[in-house]
Amino acid sequence: MSMTPREIVHELNRHIIGQDDAKRAVAIALRNRWRRMQLPEELRVEVTPKNILMIGPTGVGKTEIARRLAKLANAPFIKVEATKFTEVGYVGRDVESIIRDLADAAIKMLREQEMTRVRHRAEDAAEDRILDALLPPARMGFSNEEAPTQDSNTRQLFRKRLREGQLDDKEIEIEVAEMAGIEIATPPGMEEMTNQLQNLFANMGKGKKKARKLKVKEALKLVRDEEAGRLVNEEELKAKALEAVEQHGIVFIDEIDKVAKRGNVGGADVSREGVQRDLLPLIEGCTVNTKLGMVKTDHILFIASGAFHLSKPSDLVPELQGRLPIRVELKALSPQDFERILSEPHASLTEQYCALLKTEGLNIQFQPEGIKRLAEIAWQVNEKTENIGARRLHTLLERLLEEVSFSAGDLASAHDDKAIQIDAEYVNSHLGELAQNEDLSRYIL
């Protein structure tokens, strides 16, 4: 990650409106990963990541920051929900599976990078195998010395046609590696055993080939992936993945507030507190057994987030609070924020709806006053009913464009090239009455 904090924030600004404090915190945390790697070995070991706790109401951008961060990080990244885990001894997934999933993510990410690196060599090898199936090499005889030259010319001609896609629909018989994948259904919490069994069956079927009849296009893809897999050094890949997880891994734990203890202690709270206590060694630093080997979690960055509308950050066990030293509060959204969300981000909601309806030949245009009125209604409905943040915009837009989406084909032919204008009047006529009636808006919007 060689991007500076300012560049990271700038990239996040393309997709997320406001929440500058949260963006700055994750940008600094991400940059510190790079800074740490520049230090001498003896000092690098001592520098541990400063984990982050993001606090804010639902629908203000906590999860979206995680999603965008995953794309920027170019590091093993996993997002999990705290509610999916149970303490050791209860039926369900234990928290150590977070690190096992992170190891899987690292292997997948690095394998894709390696596959891309060897792609050209794999494509050449795959082409040769397809051409061998199309044109079996001629046997050498004493009578005809010109055969190799003619054969080479024919092969080059077929190679050209193959690259141009002229042979895509031709059917050939070719030997490809047998798919050794096998699905094993096991109860929650037994993922490690499942992985071991799958690896065992995969190794048993390794190297076996099977003749299959396929179209050239499908065969080329299969053979290319097979050749690329052969060029990738699995042992080297595992070693790199292990280092990537330990030194650059990022875990985003969502809904952390749902495992916080609430005022009245009930039976379920025992399990909640147990999950927190199981998370402690993971965040502090421990060793977890994965398919890559033993993974140390000392330098993995943990970012936790929660709405905390039924509980407070102080309801988390004190040790866990201490392991999340950086606190960031995300603010509730204002009507102006809603307006900006609808118009400013890259691939905004309004842009998405315009593009979707354009596929039917129907043009719609969102006018500034229409967007403003839509933002006001979203804010009003949130204030009157449950505040679900920017997610309210999805509900409103679906309701607003329901008739247009249903009759898009008919409207396209009726309007020719004229665009349907979504202005304040249009918004009021479709949503105004619903927004004013609290009972209706509670159930419909």
Swiss-Prot record:
One of its GO terms (molecular function) is peptidase activity. Signal peptide: none annotated. The keyword Cytoplasm applies. InterPro entries: AAA+_ATPase, ATP-dep_Clp_protease_ClpX, ATPase_AAA_core, Clp_ATPase_C, HslU, P-loop_NTPase. GO terms for biological process: protein unfolding; proteolysis involved in protein catabolic process. It is found in: Cytoplasm. Keywords: ATP-binding, Chaperone, Cytoplasm, Nucleotide-binding, Stress response. Disulfide bonds: none annotated. The keyword ATP-binding applies. Its main location: cytoplasm. One of its GO terms (cellular component) is HslUV protease complex. ATP binds at residues 17, 59-64, 254, 319, 391. A double ring-shaped homohexamer of HslV is capped on each side by a ring-shaped HslU homohexamer. The assembly of the HslU/HslV complex is dependent on binding of ATP. ATPase subunit of a proteasome-like degradation complex; this subunit has chaperone activity. The binding of ATP and its subsequent hydrolysis by HslU are essential for unfolding of protein substrates subsequently hydrolyzed by HslV. HslU recognizes the N-terminal part of its protein substrates and unfolds these before they are guided to HslV for hydrolysis. Belongs to the ClpX chaperone family. HslU subfamily. This is ATP-dependent protease ATPase subunit HslU. It comes from Pseudomonas fluorescens (strain Pf0-1). The gene is hslU.
